């Protein structure tokens, strides 16, 4: 009988420990500033500036004290769920914007409608597309910390070697220039230098093809309907597939990271990338230029890379008030300007003039093209599946599949994903 | 329930049984001293396993009947998740892929391990210690790092393998983005990393086989192949059974290198069940569904392993 | 192919002096053939390891260069300095030792005790317990991660060594593995001891365990290596950067845009490999010795 008692004993012991653990959980300190933990993924020099902004906020008042923890974005994504599930999570967390809807939908983030409505929140002048990123079903669940459209980076030395003086501004010019910049000296069928690096899956911020589709006049999701199967999208995909496979202006099978590397190693003359390409290109001694993604037949649109932060459900009232106070502080004009210059991303307020950010040429250049920015899949909860459906579409198209069939399949799958 | 004790002393009919606590059948099995002993041996491990393995498994089972994300609201949904496991296209595809992966990985890894174990067991081979260490090294590399190294080797632009093979006139192309080559590639990485460990287990098993048996066979004129078939293979039955189950379980749970090298692509051709579990749980925050899928995987693995176990136990009994 | 141990004593004593030569010549030929085959295949299999070693010493430009090189053209220690400046790497290595070492120590003790009970002691539910233990191997860690984390957090052990080690202090694989091994050991010695009245713990400690050294060493290496290389658990469990392990620390190396600095990553991996390699080299000799003395039955 002892043996059967054993599991019971062990479980009883475990339960006892659990209860002991539970009762030991801390009641919030009744005096002293409310302690708030803030997770973010700014790991480079920009992270240090953000930490400084937080420190300044802490110094500016007595009621709240924020402590930051820096991890990579991927690690935050992997560790946030367990932390929240055991109430060990941060009260403020920043994450890539397309990850926000799924967390918001599951109740991880607090509804910030009242915050936005209040007059001293400093949110009235925020870039509207940036705010679009944090809304699910019309309700805002966070605030933007970064919003920048993908830009075209080009290698000035390779340009001048090919006799091209300006970055292209339309698709046709883009392809023409790329053809001139694709060089296969030894004629073995594999160019040593490509005109452009166009990934066909896992693109930079998953934004390259959405940019092209939008510029071609098509959309992916409209409200709660998948609308990817449209004549405009078919033309766009066919246009670019032909350019890649027939004119060979880019290798096939690239992903976003490989495309980054191709450009930074000087083997591709043009590349659609994020702001970090500036410092990477500089580290690799590439004389680079920044331009807007060339305009398509319908418009000049660039999918935006967005980062947002929100208040988690593990925050109590005091902590939530503190978080909102921090957000207001963060959006003050001077702080917003400082953050823009440090992060290398355009300012989040529309009323900050270009002259204020001219000290950082990358920021100035990106701010100029900021109007081309469009949020990626705003409000789509299951962005994971939609993005992989888009990837499958583009990858198979570039590999030679039938574009119309692929679009029909993608439409069905995306519709399923957003239901 | 009695357990078969292979070397229990034979029962003498009607004889007086001494009251010593011999490991074997009999009512004295349940003496308090005996039970205390059993408990004492089992307790430390059982406490850990009950608290940190059994209880979370029960938790996960409960979660599998809900739509929980791990935090916030959760709602009981009955068997909905399980139905979805068997009707969702992506999940069914993942099951097919996992089966393919297991079918490729298990025999190849075991054959390679056994082959090298036999070679390294041969006293005619010089520098055996060196080779044993070298062949074991892939095992001590973490799977993620191994995946990085292999991805780098297979990179279509700057990869060494592609470069060398191109020199020989073979165009490897973009292996990890090729729907037909991606799966063999991820299997290869796992085989490369794991065979060293299985090899060491086989070596231990081989060295347990008395050389006198081989001598007798030699004297009888048996060839190398015959010696392998009638001595080595049967005597390895216990070891083989263990390695097969362990390899199978590892194959059915394939995740790390796929996550690093292909992310489940291209077109989901390397998406395995555990990849789906991870993505459902951590990316789509569908912990309830992830738990249900885990339990289906557990059941499949259990059935397959029990079959293997029974198969090899019978062989072991025949061999002994 | 499987030319197994030929006993020199038998043939040498039987053979007349004329037949020794061809015999020895054939053995030398087989030796040479084996050497070539095994050496070639080993070298091929070592290629990825060589990649890790050499890439760690390559400057960034050469890592991405075309045509690719195996051996670095320019050797550099940059990657290594970066590893130690960008991460608290020394602390991470120490944490890895505590984690992997702690788990291995506890697991070897707890697992062998339980395995002994399963292999040698008859009790009701022995087979069922075994199946339950094996079954627990079949659920992937990703599924039980959240409940385990919640449990450990409720115990108040988040970010502590106790919490990191406890869930692994006994493991189903080890119990299964040792149970199989104990089963293969002959019972004569322990039965004799039992008849003499020795207690089970004594039998376990002085008879069974000494004969199980190769299995214990194998399991020890397996457990240590796997926990040293484990990523998901230390990553999720330690939110404090200083408490992480080497593997979880390396994930923090991802640069902006998801670009991984290959050279630095390889340097870190190489350093992470070294303790394991040294450990195996040390254990390996004992492994051979102990098998040599106890193996032939």
Locate each region found by the language model:
Chain B
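Short, Lys/Arg-rich, polar N-terminal cytosolic tail immediately upstream
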Residues: 1-32
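A structural signal for multi-pass alpha-helical bundles of membrane permease subunits
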Residues: 34-320
